[in-house]
Amino acid sequence: MEVKASLKYARVGAQKARLVADLVRGKDVNEAVKTLTFLNKKTAGMVKKLIESAVANAEYKKVMDVDSLYVKAIWVDQGPVLKRFRPRAQGRAFGVRKKTSHINVVLEEK
């Protein structure tokens, strides 16, 4: 049986989030949380909370042993881009693209 959790509209680029997702894919849940705790990246905290949310979903359903869960799948999709303008010299303005992403995780028992 699988449990899922997702984080929508995370204010981080998909390419940067995929670097963190690749580190925990296939790992035991406890090992993944330890890895993310000491990883010095903005996305690591988001993915850690997402995995903990999926574990809480498994506890709530009461159909799985939480200690035997592992990260079966984790993927990052690109979300909508927030377009902003940054004022520049002599009345000009440059466009700034603030990227978002959707992070999904699936946990399963070993």
From Swiss-Prot:
Recorded GO MF terms: rRNA binding; structural constituent of ribosome
UniProt key word rRNA-binding: yes
Any Gene Ontology CC annotation: cytosolic large ribosomal subunit
Keywords: Ribonucleoprotein, Ribosomal protein, RNA-binding, rRNA-binding
GO BP terms, alphabetized: translation
The organism's place on the tree of life at top rank: Bacteria
InterPro entries registered for this protein in UniProt: Ribosomal_uL22, Ribosomal_uL22_bac/chlpt-type, Ribosomal_uL22_bac/org-type, Ribosomal_uL22_CS, Ribosomal_uL22_sf
Cysteine-cysteine disulfides: none
PANTHER family per the UniProt record, alphabetical: CHLOROPLAST 50S RIBOSOMAL PROTEIN L22-RELATED (PTHR13501), LARGE RIBOSOMAL SUBUNIT PROTEIN UL22M (PTHR13501:SF8)
Complexes and interactors: Part of the 50S ribosomal subunit.
Function: This protein binds specifically to 23S rRNA; its binding is stimulated by other ribosomal proteins, e.g. L4, L17, and L20. It is important during the early stages of 50S assembly. It makes multiple contacts with different domains of the 23S rRNA in the assembled 50S subunit and ribosome.
Family note: Belongs to the universal ribosomal protein uL22 family.
Name the UniProt record assigns to this protein: Large ribosomal subunit protein uL22
Organism annotation: Bdellovibrio bacteriovorus (strain ATCC 15356 / DSM 50701 / NCIMB 9529 / HD100)
Encoding gene per record: rplV
